Amino acid sequence: MVRGRNRRAARRKRAAKRLKMQMWIDAYILQWDLDQAQKDLENARTRMLTEEMERLEEEVEMLMRELELLERMEEDG
């Protein structure tokens, strides 16, 4: 009777150890996934900011050309 209980307790202890180890592994994987997602998000933000800056630079160049044209028209007319 005692021996059976010890076996059951040992079995439960091993199962608990396996479960705990699996939980640690899952937590590590989730943390890695989170880190990767944060890096991807930062890269996307950088890419979006770069695209926005390029768009704004083009807009500024266009406005500068328009201003030059207006100045020329003013000088001519």
From Swiss-Prot:
Keywords: Host cytoplasm, Host nucleus
Cytoplasm found in the keyword field: no
Coiled-coil region list: none
Source domain of life: Viruses
Keyword Transferase: no
Signal peptide feature range: none
A GO CC annotation given for this chain: host cell cytoplasm
Localization terms from the record: Host cytoplasm; Host nucleus; Host nucleus, Host nucleolus
Function: May function as a nucleic acid binding protein that modulates transcription of genes participating in the IFN response.
Protein name according to UniProt: Protein NS4
Organism annotation: Bluetongue virus 13 (isolate 13B89Z)
